[in-house]
Amino acid sequence: MVVSKMNKDAQMRAAINQKLIETGERERLKELLRAKLIECGWKDQLKAHCKEVIKEKGLEHVTVDDLVAEITPKGRALVPDSVKKELLQRIRTFLAQHASL
Amino acid sequence: MKMEEMSLSGLDNSKLEAIAQEIYADLVEDSCLGFCFEVHRAVKCGYFFLDDTDPDSMKDFEIVDQPGLDIFGQVFNQWKSKECVCPNCSRSIAASRFAPHLEKCLGMGRNSSRIANRRIANSNSMNKSESDQEDNDDINDNDWSYGSEKKDWELKVTLPFILLSYTAKKRKSDKLWYLPFQNPNSPRRSKSLKHKNGFSVCTSASNTLPLLFSSSGELSNSDPFKYNNSTGISYETLGPEELRSLLTTLIFLFQQCGVISEHTKKMCTRSLRCPQHTDEQRRAVRIYFLGPSAVLPEVESSLDNDSFDMTDSQALISRLQWDGSSDLSPSDSGSSKTSENQGWGLGTNSSESRKTKKKKSHLSLVGTASGLGSNKKKKPKPPAPPTPSIYDDIN
């Protein structure tokens, strides 16, 4: 029972992701988020943080994994509420449109 | 597909919300990942720290926000008070007006520029202390020398100006013609030019030389020199070189084709019957230089005194010889040409003048009349001679 439910959830998620990509909504959302983040200074804040990290580790020894580990939590936290809300709203509308099918 | 629909429709709101959050987190992580790749690439390529500046230089290039200064901290209305000195007339002109002034002053515009130039020269000569004489001379030399190497436009402007006085005497009105010749400080202006016949013509040392002559035909013509004087009036006020080049051009037009080539901008030196140019072209050139009354020389001899006749031209030739013999360098082609004809010119001089006496179209100059009395003396002409005195002196 539990396994079948998990299986069903996974299937559902996969189906939704498929739909997101097929309709191109994912690309649109990504582009919107990027624009919003640049607009609100998220990128500049992260860049400043990056500089600290890089200076700490040394220019030659920085790897992508290091950067991702350091930056991603910070990046998630720094997203402004307004941007988050707008994006969630768009995702919900998308889901509502396609859940009714 | 059917299952999918079922599953989607069967979800409750909390599940949908969870999925939405998941998608959002996914997207943010994507962005972060993209950013990390970007930074990493910049670091490895070495352009990540390019836009870094130290705080000192940041302070140096801070934007200035003060009244009266621009963002760089410079005073921005400085230019308003700036004045430029004109290299031509050495007046100081506001910077904003300098370009239009220079255009006029240097003669790039229309003919008005030359008038302006003349006016400036006149005013300068009125109070000589203003500018040094060398400058003035240079300006005036440019104005009044038309050697063969000079450009066409100089000839175009100056020649008709002088010839105006010449052709004007053809009209039978009693008008007085003022020709405000300027060449203020030129030393040759103060020279007393000696005529071949022992008659000295007085040229004025004054700076503005108003030429006054009348075209009345009722003047007494007993004096054989009078005609010479009358034809020579406008030329005697010119310097010897100027006179020579002018008259050389005139003679040229009576002896040679003279049509100005479109390519070389030079006058044709072939004979009047030159096959390369038509009579029409020759006529156009003569009208261009001598005014509408001028016609081709070969036709002229048969025409009456309304045209530019041969006696006049010969009188001119004689004047040229007088001039050429004065103090000119023989190397010049114009003077050498005149010296060839000198004997003939002298011989015909008096006879020609006698002929023209009968035509009753003469000019006379005030200055020359007074010059008759005071022979060989430098005597400045009155700047504006009273009209009645002309007739008194002459009669």
UniProtKB/Swiss-Prot annotation, chain A:
One of its GO terms (molecular function) is transcription coactivator activity. It comes from the Eukaryota. There is a cross-link at K74 (Glycyl lysine isopeptide (Lys-Gly) (interchain with G-Cter in SUMO2)). Keywords: Acetylation, Activator, Chromatin regulator, Isopeptide bond, mRNA transport, Nucleus, Protein transport, Transcription, Transcription regulation, Translocation, Transport, Ubl conjugation. The keyword Acetylation applies. InterPro entries: TF_ENY2 (IPR018783), TF_EnY2_sf (IPR038212). The keyword Ion transport does not apply. GO terms for biological process: chromatin organization; negative regulation of insulin secretion involved in cellular response to glucose stimulus; poly(A)+ mRNA export from nucleus; positive regulation of DNA-templated transcription; protein transport; regulation of DNA repair; regulation of RNA splicing; regulation of transcription by RNA polymerase II. It is found in: Nucleus, Nucleoplasm. One of its GO terms (cellular component) is transcription factor TFTC complex. Its main location: nucleus. Belongs to the ENY2 family. Involved in mRNA export coupled transcription activation by association with both the TREX-2 and the SAGA complexes. The transcription regulatory histone acetylation (HAT) complex SAGA is a multiprotein complex that activates transcription by remodeling chromatin and mediating histone acetylation and deubiquitination. Within the SAGA complex, participates in a subcomplex that specifically deubiquitinates both histones H2A and H2B. The SAGA complex is recruited to specific gene promoters by activators such as MYC, where it is required for transcription. Component of the nuclear pore complex (NPC)-associated TREX-2 complex (transcription and export complex 2), composed of at least ENY2, the isoform GANP of the MCM3AP gene, PCID2, SEM1, and either centrin CETN2 or CETN3. TREX-2 contains 2 ENY2 chains. The TREX-2 complex also associates with ALYREF/ALY and with the nucleoporin NUP153. Component of some SAGA transcription coactivator-HAT complexes, at least composed of ATXN7, ATXN7L3, ENY2, GCN5L2, SUPT3H/SPT3, TAF10, TRRAP and USP22. This is Transcription and mRNA export factor ENY2. The lineage of its organism: Eukaryota, Metazoa, Chordata, Craniata, Vertebrata.
